[in-house]
Amino acid sequence: VAKIIANVSPKKTGSAKLGEFQFDAREGYLYVSARAVSATVNSNLDAFSAEELERAWQTFINKPVFVEHESQDIKRARGVIIDAMFHDEDPEDVWVEILMEMDEKTFPILCSYIRSGELDTMSMGCNLAYSTCSICGNEAITELDYCDHIISKGSYYYIDGQLKQSYENCC
C-alpha cells in the first residue's frame, strides 16, 4: 500500500473508513483520495441509487480531474483518477471513493492548497442517459425535457399529505 498524501474532505466520509488503495506512487505526484459520490441526494439535488453506483463505479478510473468543472478542454485536466472503490459495508451509507494522481511540478499551487487543507472539497461531474423527477417521475434526456419541478429543483411540494423536495434521480 503506497501512501495517500491527502484526503479531500475527510470529515465528509462520516463513519466510513477510507479504503486502502494498492498503487505505485510516482515521485513528484500528489495522491488524493476522496468520496466522489454517495447513494443519496447531494447538495446539487441530484440523487444516485446504490444500484447505479454499484453498476458504474469503475467508470471513474482513468478519467481526468478538473478544477471548477472546466472539463470542455482536456488540456485543462489537473490529474487523473487512477483507481476507485465501491463501498457498501454500511447499507445506509453506500458510496464511491476515488484515488486521484496530480503532478505537483506542473500544478504546485493546486497541490499546495490540497496539502494545506485550504482546498478540502470536491465535486463530481457525470454524463447521464436520463434523469427522473422525484415528484412526478418525468424522464428527461436533455434540459429541454425538464418538468416544472426540476426547473425549480429544491422546491417543496405536498404529495399525498407529505412534504417532498424536488430533485433529479440520475440514471
Regions found by a protein language model. Give the residues of each.
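Signature of dsDNA virion morphogenesis modules
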Residues: 1-171
